[in-house]
UniProtKB/Swiss-Prot annotation:
Encoding gene (name): XRN2
Modified residues (Phosphoserine): S448, S471, S473, S475, S482, S487, S499, S501, S678
Omega-N-methylarginine PTM positions: R824, R847, R851, R883, R895, R946
Residues carrying Asymmetric dimethylarginine: R824, R847, R851, R880, R883, R946
Taxonomic lineage of the native organism: Eukaryota, Metazoa, Chordata, Craniata, Vertebrata
Single Gene Ontology MF annotation: zinc ion binding
A Gene Ontology term for the protein's cellular component: nucleolus
Subunit structure, interactors included: Interacts with POLR2A and SMN1/SMN2. Interacts with CDKN2AIP and NKRF. Interacts with CDKN2AIPNL; the interaction is direct. Interacts with TRIM71 (via NHL repeats) in an RNA-dependent manner. Interacts with DHX34; the interaction is RNA-independent.
Protein name per UniProt: 5'-3' exoribonuclease 2
């Protein structure tokens, strides 16, 4: 969803929706990697039923990553995708269903955004290549050092589009991957797997939502199914709320801004290509072969709990004294609808509503003030009440002028602060900064410039002599680097962006000045604002778009042909008289075919993915559709600072002209291209342990060509139709690996079959309600009346999925170490930097039980009697504290240890404060609960939950 910063805004406003994933890493023994056993209980204290993968969010980072070296070829890309799915699977561990959805042919409304994105990617890629070559030639001409240019084929990410050979090969590889895991991974043993590849029309996330909607409408659906959806798009949050499922979680990779990226020329960090100077890299050691490698830090995953977001929204949207019955489900639907006004993949956002300016909060406040007058909610099951929406939009229009003026004031204030900050930093800089091997550096800074040189003066002197001998003359104006070596490119002028005043983008509209509406329509639409007919046409198209998008989220695609025919949105104050505007769409429309979509979204530079005769239509000057493929196009910054925030002014594709031109080249398609140009469906896979396995085998043995109903009692209530798969994977047949580096499956027990969701009439309405029998999860947020009803008890926030999760405590040795190095009181501690004291014994007297296991720890043979032990006393007497759980039975080995240590007196081994003991602590814990120890005036507290590392 095209809402930049939406997730950041959401996670800051509602912080409890985020939970960090607990991930069990694969182990390695003697060079052999041992995979994670996903059949074991989930370490996140929650069990998921269904896992849905929006595959395009996995394909892109695996094929062209930004923070690590890119795969060398297509085979490595496929292996990277497999490993990414394995990692997600080991975190979520679904028990019923794995649904993998790849983007197929998108609706016409989405194709405009895809076209803009692909044209931009092509243009930016060519511009980056030209700039890179220019800087390289400039550096080499001045004597700079650059690594030899690596000759490799550039990966065009535009190939990740339905209809290309890459996507066809990906589908084959995923079939092999599913068969391999169902045969060999115990976590996949009883799993149903559905693959919806790029031949099935529809966006990946919307194919997933369509599956959920259709299954919810079946009588055998479990209303308490726990769904987990993987994807990074903001619209997944809206789609998850639109299902009205009580248990819905989103897993996504945690976004860490400002990740360091290497320079494309010298592979060094800290600068971009335009700032590269071709300096030699300072290696940390003499033989540092890894100095030129990129850091490959593995990203972390987080859970986004939509049930907690529903709690937040219920509190925020609850209103008293309504003239109608309050319904939290309808209120959440209205909130989802209002989020569309700040932008999405199908419509531009309104000029007065920016997510960074808390536009959603403003809309919610207006909604709560106006809803008493509307007489009801804005939406119902994906259909919009335009009369009520008009009241909301006109209320926004009344404050548009003040919004524009405040935006200008905030921008001017920010620029003024930034300018003062630059001046202050420039003023505080020293007039002279020493450099070279005699430069003073902070103690212990191993990465400081010159630290390696200064550590070996003889080597440094030798290298300087050799360098002087190899350089016959050095100009007095030559600049030197921090290690004393001359810079090959001295005297480079300061770049314009380093100056105190940065040029601001030209803004001819000036929304903060009077006459902003006239200037806006003149500059953006080339029309007069007084032209009421044109303004109404723009508003009507936008209103149709709002209705289409909401229907798309709640009911499915209302029309495959509809699209918004303008680059810009109208003003909120223009939404007058929209109550009478039609919001119906043409029925019976069909999606584009894959190769037709490629012709509609690809620039001419990506024509190599198309058949030769089709490609010619994009570049031949005599082509009837040559105007669809401009070599260059304007980008309107639209008041923004960066080009990626601007609007690409591309011509819209005329579907009628495109189809007419393609009719002449359709006969040129080969049988393989014709197959790739056809629309397909979903495929279902099961292993030999699944109840459906024998049922599907019987269908293949009978050879029936008629669709057969899926027996819901054999697959957790899933319903639909089965039909035989021409490219089926069958038991006792070898599954050949499409990736040469992976082995063939010679002992296969997996079977696949075509699967089709339950079908409904075109005018059927899926009810946006919580199903009967659904149980809401326990509340996570602090009750608003907690202070009144808690009787003084302190609120304990829920940190994970389970409030009764058993904390894992540190053992005795860890507490001794922490107690030694941490401060003793309000001061810093006299041994805060000292190493832990050496242990005089091995083993732990009390070892905590591992959750879910009954492991008996081995008693160390060298554990000596207590009267001969002279080590430091333990800081804490280890105990078990289980919140909300009854006391566990005392195991025999625990009773034995207690009996053995019954005569132990904790104060008989006290030592003086010093390296071998512990300084006395302040007696400030008298009010804490615990078991008093002899010799102390305060009881000890239980192990802190601060170190709850499970």
């Amino acid at each position: 969803m095209g809402v930049p910063a939406f997730f950041r805004w959401l996670s800051r406003k509602y912080p409890s929706i985020i939970v960090n994933c607990v991930e069990e890493k694969p182990k390695e023994c003697n060079g052999v990697k041992i995979p994670v056993d996903a059949s074991k209980p989930n370490p996140n204290d929650v069990e998921f039923d269904n896992l849905y993968l929006d595959m395009n969010g996995i394909i892109h980072p695996c094929t062209h990553p930004e923070d690590k070296p890119a795969p060398k070829n297509e085979d490595e890309m496929m292996v990277a995708i497999f490993e990414y799915i394995d990692r997600l699977f080991s975190i979520v561990r679904p028990r019923r269903l794995l649904y993998m959805a790849i983007d197929g042919v998108a609706p016409r409304a989405k194709m405009n955004q895809q076209r803009s994105r692909r044209f931009r990617a092509s243009k930016e890629g060519m511009e980056a290549a030209v700039e890179k070559q220019r800087v390289r030639e400039e550096i080499l001409a001045k004597g700079g050092f650059l690594p030899p240019e690596e000759i490799k084929e550039r990966f065009d990410s535009n190939c990740i589009t339905p209809g290309t050979e890459f996507m066809d090969n990906l589908a084959k590889c995923l079939r092999y991957y599913i068969a391999d895991r169902l045969n060999n991974d115990p976590g996949w043993k009883n799993l149903t797997v559905i693959l919806s590849d790029a031949s099935a029309p529809g966006e990946g996330e919307h194919k997933i939502m369509d599956y959920i909607r259709r299954q919810r409408a079946q009588p055998n659906h479990d209303p308490n199914t726990h769904h987990c959806l993987c994807g990074a798009d903001a619209d997944l949050i809206m789609l998850g709320l639109a299902t009205h499922e009580p248990n819905f979680t989103i897993i996504r990779e945690e976004f860490k801004p400002n990740k360091p990226k290497p320079c494309g020329l010298c592979n060094q960090f800290g600068h971009e290509v335009k700032d590269c100077e071709g300096l030699l890299r300072e290696k940390k050691v003499k033989h540092d072969e890894l100095a030129d490698s990129l850091p490959c830090a593995e990203g972390e995953f987080i859970f986004l709990r939509l049930n907690v977001l529903r709690e937040y929204l219920e509190r925020e949207l609850t209103m008293a004294s309504l003239p109608f019955t309050f319904d939290v489900e309808r209120s959440i639907d209205d909130w989802v609808f209002m989020c569309f006004f700040v932008g999405n993949d199908f419509l531009p956002h309104l000029p007065s509503l920016e997510i960074r300016e808390n536009a959603i909060d403003r809309l919610v406040n207006i909604y709560k003030n106006v809803v008493h007058k509307t007489g009801g909610y804005l939406t119902e099951s994906g259909y919009v009440n335009l009369q009520r929406v008009q009241m909301i939009m006109l209320a926004v229009g009344e404050v548009e002028d003040s919004i524009f003026k405040k935006r200008k004031d905030d921008e001017d204030s920010f620029r003024r602060r930034q300018k003062e900050k630059r001046k202050r930093m420039k003023r505080d800089q020293p007039a002279f900064t020493p450099s070279g091997i005699l430069t003073p550096h902070a103690l212990g800074s191993r990465n400081s410039p010159g630290s390696q040189v200064a550590s070996n003066p003889r080597q440094a002197a030798y290298e300087m002599r050799m360098q002087n001998n190899s350089s016959p003359s050095i100009s007095p104006n030559t600049s030197f680097t921090s290690d004393g070596s001359p810079s090959p490119i001295g005297g480079i002028k300061r770049k314009a962006e380093d100056s105190d005043s940065e040029p601001e983008p030209e803004d001819n509209v000036r929304l903060w000045e009077a006459g902003w509406k006239q200037r806006y329509y003149k500059n953006k639409f080339d029309a007069d604002a007084a032209d009421e007919k044109f303004r109404r046409k723009v508003v009507q198209s936008y209103v149709e778009g709002l209705c289409w998008v909401l229907r798309y989220y709640y009911q499915g695609c209302a029309s495959w042909k509809w699209y918004y025919p303008f680059h810009y949105a109208p003003f909120a104050s223009d939404f007058e008289g929209i109550a009478d505007m039609p919001s119906d769409f043409e029925k019976g429309t069909k999606p584009f075919k894959p190769l037709e979509q490629l012709m509609g979204v690809f620039p001419a530079a990506s024509g190599n993915f198309l058949p030769p005769s089709w490609r010619k239509l994009m570049s031949d000057p005599d082509s009837s559709i040559i105007d669809f493929y401009p070599e260059d196009f304007a980008i309107d910054l639209n008041g923004k600072k960066y080009a990626w925030q601007g609007v690409a002014l591309l011509p819209f594709v005329d579907e009628r002209r495109l189809r007419a031109a393609l009719e002449e080249v359709y006969p040129d398609l080969t049988p393989e291209e014709t197959r790739r140009n056809s629309l397909g469906g979903d495929v279902l896979f099961v292993g030999k342990h699944h109840p459906l396995h024998d049922f599907i085998l019987e269908l293949y043995q009978t050879g029936s060509t008629e669709p057969v109903d899926v027996p819901p009692e054999l697959c957790h209530g899933i319903q639909g139709k089965f039909s035989l798969d021409e490219e089926a994977i069958l038991p006792d047949q070898i599954v050949c690996s499409p990736v040469p580096m992976l082995r063939d499956l010679t002992q296969n027990t997996v079977v696949s079959i075509n699967f089709k969701d339950p079908q409904f009439a075109e005018d059927y309405i899926f009810k946006a309600v919580m199903l009967p029998g659904a149980r809401k999860p326990a509340a996570v947020l602090k009750p608003s009346d907690w202070e009144k009803s808690s009787n003084g008890r302190q609120w304990k926030p829920q940190l994970g999925f389970n409030r009764d999760r058993r904390p894992v405590h540190l053992d005795q040795a860890a507490f001794r170490t922490l107690g030694h190095v941490m401060p003793r009181g309000s001061g810093t501690g006299i041994y805060s930097n000292a190493a832990p004291p050496p242990a005089t014994y091995q083993g732990n007297l009390y070892r905590p039980l591992l959750r879910g296991q009954a492991q008996i720890p081995k008693l160390m043979s060298n554990m000596r009697p207590q009267d001969s032990w002279r080590g430091p006393p333990p800081l804490f007497q280890q105990q078990r504290f289980d919140r909300g759980v009854g006391a566990e039975p005392l195991l025999p080995w625990n009773r034995m240890l207690q009996t053995q240590n019954a005569a132990f007196q904790p104060n008989q081994y006290q030592m003086l404060a010093g390296p071998g003991g512990y300084p006395p602590r302040r007696d400030d814990r008298g009010g804490r609960q615990g078991y008093p120890r002899e010799g102390r005036k305060y009881p000890l507290s239980p192990p802190s939950g601060r170190y709850n590392w499970n």
